[in-house]
């Protein structure tokens, strides 16, 4: 927190952080040619973690100062700036060199739910209710049925499982519902997990070798690269983070995957930090890598 407060203050843009920054100097590292400024989604993940820490460290002295520093960082973020003055949804990026040229509006149910929740609840620079409601626009807001499971506010075939992980590290879906997810976000997130599992067991090509102990599609390393695996983007690769980070939603089914990896693939899939990022039985491929954003939800 001291690093974020002291090293990044002059490099923050409207209080927001870049996608990447130098871990020693705090200066921005460009993620792409025009993505060399503020990233409000990555900022929201950081703020989510900081607010969790602020709620946990409730002591006096150093912990009291920690809470003040976190509050200062949280209050500095000008969420409303990222509506581009349109009062009609958030934009993902802003650059001091290119402005809003990337023009990527944030919409649909995905990992950005926490971005909208933090933006509308900011004590200093909140967006309006109208701007918040923009997330429901586009294909990401549709009631659908897959593999016998009805789901609210879903994109085509629900998307990767990290949609129900990243935002809900800090948000409690059991206490969330709105006009668009009337049955509540807990039911919605459980259902997305069950659909992901049901796709693997019932719908996916048999050659992919999915089973009750080998399922779970989400963003991960794959053989030869990286992708956001999902029922409509199936690369025959299971990422342990998919099922294991879904433990609150499907504890019994998720434990089956964990025990399978540990008991049957430990020599290939288990290292210092637990299970490696992904593996494919179809292609006899096993990652030897870790991705922090996959390990954290576990």
Predicted region positions:
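Ser/Thr/Asn(+Pro)-rich, low-complexity disordered segments
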Residues: 1-297
């Amino acid at each position: 927190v001291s690093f974020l407060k002291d090293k990044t203050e002059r490099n923050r843009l409207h209080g927001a952080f870049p996608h990447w920054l130098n871990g020693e100097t705090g200066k921005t590292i460009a993620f792409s040619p025009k993505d060399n400024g503020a990233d409000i989604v990555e900022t929201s993940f950081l703020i989510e973690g900081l607010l969790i820490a602020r709620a946990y460290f409730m002591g006096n002295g150093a912990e009291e100062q920690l809470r003040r520093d976190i509050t200062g960082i949280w209050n500095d973020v000008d969420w409303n700036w990222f509506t581009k003055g349109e009062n009609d949804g958030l934009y993902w990026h802003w650059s001091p060199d290119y402005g809003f040229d990337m023009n990527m509006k944030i919409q649909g149910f995905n990992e950005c739910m926490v971005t909208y929740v933090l933006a509308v609840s900011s004590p200093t620079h909140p967006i309006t209710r109208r701007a918040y409601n923009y997330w429901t626009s586009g294909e990401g807001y549709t009631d659908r049925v897959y593999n016998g499971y009805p789901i609210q506010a879903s994109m085509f075939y629900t998307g990767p499982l990290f949609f129900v992980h990243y935002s809900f590290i800090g948000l409690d879906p059991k206490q969330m519902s709105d006009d668009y997810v009337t049955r509540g976000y807990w039911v919605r997130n459980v259902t997305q997990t069950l659909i992901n599992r049901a796709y693997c067991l019932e719908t996916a090509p048999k050659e992919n070798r999915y089973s009750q102990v080998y399922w779970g599609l989400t963003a991960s390393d794959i053989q030869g690269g990286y992708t956001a695996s999902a029922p409509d983007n199936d690369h025959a690769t299971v990422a342990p983070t998919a099922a294991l980070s879904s433990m609150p939603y499907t504890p019994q089914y998720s434990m089956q995957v964990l025990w399978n990896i540990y008991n049957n693939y430990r020599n290939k899939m288990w290292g210092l930090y637990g299970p490696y990022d992904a593996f494919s039985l179809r292609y006899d491929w096993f990652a030897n890598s870790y991705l922090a954003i996959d390990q954290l939800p576990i």
